[in-house]
Amino acid sequence: MSDWDSVTRIGAKHRAGAAPRETVVRGKSALNAAQRQGLVIATEKKYATGNAAGKTAAMEGQHLTKVDRSDDIVKPKTVGLQVADAIKKRRNEEGYKMTQKELATKCNTTITVIQDFERGTAAPDQKVLSAMERVLNIKLRGSDIGKEKFPKKK
């Protein structure tokens, strides 16, 4: 057969049906249908989507992917005892004396979040940490944790 006899067809209607294409299944019924046909099914968790994910959310997604793919146990990140002690100490100092409830109200969060931070078991939340820094006037992030953010001038 020479090159003159062969016909080249281009377009979606003339595609050869070689292998089934990868598709995203949306719903239980489509998943069950694929299982009945004996197709290969792979599940992947999508951690961050589009513009909803900021810089910190992307890092969190990377951490979750690392946890998902590793076989050994990965400890979740916590604020630590140094931050917890700094919050407790400052909350009980004269001039800043307040209850956990009052601190939670001023930081626009719940009492349980404040309790977790004071225990040192809370996951580092930048929004809550910045609010606490503002209310308590101490640094809770960086190198000098517990130091005054804006020291009084002499």
Swiss-Prot record:
Keywords associated with the record: Activator, DNA-binding, Transcription, Transcription regulation
Domain HTH cro/C1-type: 87-143
Highest taxon of the lineage: Eukaryota
Chain positions covered by the region annotation Disordered: 1-23
Molecular function via GO: DNA binding
Start-end of DNA-binding region: 100-119
Listed GO CC annotations: nucleus
InterPro entries: Cro/C1-type_HTH (IPR001387), Lambda_DNA-bd_dom_sf (IPR010982), MBF1_N (IPR013729)
Sequence similarity: Belongs to the MBF1 family.
Function: Transcriptional coactivator that stimulates GCN4-dependent transcriptional activity by bridging the DNA-binding region of GCN4 and TBP (SPT15), thereby recruiting TBP to GCN4-bound promoters. Involved in induction of the ribosome quality control (RQC) pathway; a pathway that degrades nascent peptide chains during problematic translation. Required to prevent stalled ribosomes from frameshifting.
Name assigned to this protein: Multiprotein-bridging factor 1
Organism: Aspergillus fumigatus (strain ATCC MYA-4609 / CBS 101355 / FGSC A1100 / Af293) (Neosartorya fumigata)
